[in-house]
Amino acid sequence: MEAWIEFGRGPLFRLTFSLMVLGLLRVFILTIVGIAEAYRRSSDRIVPWKQVARQTAGWLFPIGRLWRKRAVYSSTSFLFHAGLLLVPFFLAAHVLLWSRSLGFAWPAMPRRLADWLTLLTIGAALGLFFGRVLHRCARALSRPQDYFWPWLLAIPFVTGYACANLAVRPEAYQTSMLLHVYSADLIMAMVPFTKIAHCVLAPLSQTVTAVSWKFVPGAGDRVAATLGYTDRPIWIEKARSDAAPAAFADARKGTCPK
């Protein structure tokens, strides 16, 4: 089993990491190309870039937005993403692994902080899962992978914490380490081909929305006409929900379609 573990955190790790990086780079480049193509083909090239930049910053650093809607769920999601980013890159054992593969290293976080972040990430994964299961609106918008991913992403954290902190027999330790290594490799291999690719697309999300709205000539105008906004610009500072008696009635009430 030790040979399988070494293979998983050696050649297989380098392969899946390379696949993840190249795959995410491809997704990022194709998105940029799509934005440029939409902008080139549009007859309306007026885009409020400053507003888009502010909205992008607000989505990347959502501290002030966490309490607006579903505060507990939003805060849980924020903690989950923080743990996913920090622990894999700054846990001391992981820094050593990165050093072996990349040839250089960086400072590691304290062990106690890593343990607490690991536990918070595990708890947040459970919270996100049940937050979808128990919330009717979230269930209506969720796909099967939305329920699958929190569990898969939690496996490396559960097994890693067990290996680092629990006194177990050598056989149990090796089994946990095998699950830890191969679940992480599986995640890296899947990232570019699933919704987790949003980790590199998040900085572009508001730009995509602003530009792609005009991708099909006249599409934005037709949507605005359907909503009764033919006399208003497509992008405005204030949300239109206050003036939309029918289209946004459910949104104002905090309900969702059945």
Each model region followed by its residue ranges:
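Membrane-embedded alpha-helical bundles that constitute the cytochrome b-like, heme-associated redox core
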Residues: 1-258
